[in-house]
């Protein structure tokens, strides 16, 4: 009887852990298709160093822009960072980093340690600007064309499949 109870408990725990593991893939949960084709709002964003502001309409000067919402305390952001470095080498793409609810010193240290893929770095200490972009967690990444039209939104860390998809889009 004790053996049956132990096996039942073990099977139940395996079921629970499997369910939790499968639920971690948030890309399947959130539908990002409804924002594809919409234009981002024209807003003023404060640069990370407080030197001036950046107006989103300025991205019309670039063929493609990738907005990446990140923080130094975010483990998945650390995981995707090497992929942002790869993408930053593409001449058709400018990456704008939006530092989300982060400590400025720690954010600087993160970029010194991991490399800085950002053409422009924005600060968002309260997360307000990120919410205006429809971002509710990090990392999230939004690919925009020069008409300010959203081409793709990625929820979670960019992986190699995402990098290849972005490269394909920006080299067409």
Regions found by a protein language model. Name each.
Residues 69-86:
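Conserved redox-active cysteine motifs that mediate thiol-disulfide chemistry
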Residues 41, 70, 96, 131:
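Conserved Rossmann-like nucleotide-binding pocket used by diverse enzymes
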Residues 44-65:
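A short beta-strand-turn-helix
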Residues 112-117, 124-171:
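Thiol/disulfide oxidoreductase modules built on the thioredoxin-like
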């Amino acid at each position: 009887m004790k053996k049956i109870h132990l096996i039942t408990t073990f099977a139940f725990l395996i079921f629970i852990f499997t369910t939790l593991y499968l639920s971690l893939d948030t890309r399947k949960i959130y539908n990002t298709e409804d924002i594809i084709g919409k234009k981002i709002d024209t807003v003023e964003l404060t640069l990370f160093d407080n030197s001036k502001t950046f107006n989103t309409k300025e991205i019309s000067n670039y063929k493609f822009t990738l907005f990446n919402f990140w923080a130094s305390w975010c483990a998945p952001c650390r995981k995707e960072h090497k992929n942002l470095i790869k993408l930053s080498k593409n001449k058709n793409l400018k990456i704008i980093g939006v530092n989300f609810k982060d400590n400025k010193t720690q954010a600087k240290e993160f970029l010194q340690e991991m490399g800085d893929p950002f053409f422009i770095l924005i600060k968002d200490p309260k997360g307000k600007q990120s919410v205006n972009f429809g971002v509710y967690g990090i990392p999230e990444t939004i690919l925009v064309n020069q008409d300010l039209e959203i081409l793709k939104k990625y929820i979670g860390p960019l992986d190699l499949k995402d990098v290849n998809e972005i490269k394909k889009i920006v080299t067409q």
